[in-house]
Amino acid sequence: MASPPAPRHRVRAQVNRPLVAAGLLVLLPLVVVAERLHRGAGRRVARWGVAVVAFLCGVRFERRGRGPGPGSPGVVVVPNHSSPMDIPALLWAEPEVRFLAAADLFRVPLLAAAMRALGTVPIDRRDRYRARDQLDALVDRRRAATGSPGDIVVFAEGGIAPAGTRLPFRSGAFSLAIRTGAPVAPVAIRGSDRVLAPRGHLLVRPGVVTVEFLEPIDTGGLTSDDRGVLRDHVRDIVCAATASTS
């Protein structure tokens, strides 16, 4: 659970707010332009921009464990979701991953253009059958283009958990992993809610955000009947790791 911010951090957060807003206004169009000029350049620009803005705000990212990395056969990355800061932290730690995002976010034109440049996939979470079709289409496109389904980040909680809590994991990520035969890579993100609260309104406080890639779980031989057991197992692993302060 996030502890109350120190007074000096509250002041710094107010100073950081316009800095973060300006950073977004500059970075989002840069990502779009870079990706149009050269495939993959948008990701490099995004990672660089995240690192620069984080540094200026007094935020430090740490990466632990072995993530998918270059040449990955494709994994379903399942992190906890405690803060909007989780997304830039993951993008910094593993820039090749692709995110799923609620379709509603794509109604914001500049944000939508940047997300598309990063390969983010809109998902209609109100219709699980349509969401499944969208996921299957994504995997098929990636497999046809690269021979691999790619590394896909799914926030299994379905949204940002209220401060100090964990939401139940939904089954979609695990159904996807079983259908595609991809391993599940649990990820524990710690400190993000102290840096940016769930409803932080760009009030970024100085601090450390740790992204820890845990041991991948093989889904070979599993069927759709096993998705609930797999889901609960991964949730237990992630919850135990996020509770750790080591």
Task: Show the residue positions of the predicted features.
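A transmembrane-helix-recognition feature enriched in membrane-embedded lipid enzymes
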Residues: S3-E62, A113-L118
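Non-catalytic C-terminal accessory region of glycerolipid acyltransferases
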Residues: A2-R10, R132-S246
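Catalytic core of membrane glycerolipid acyltransferases/transacylases, capturing the structured
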Residues: L27, V31-V32, R36, G71-R128
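Glycine-rich helix-loop-beta junction characteristic of Rossmann-like nucleotide cofactor-binding loops
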Residues: G65-P70
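Short gly/ser/thr-rich secondary-structure transition/capping motifs
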Residues: F55-R64, L167, D193-L196
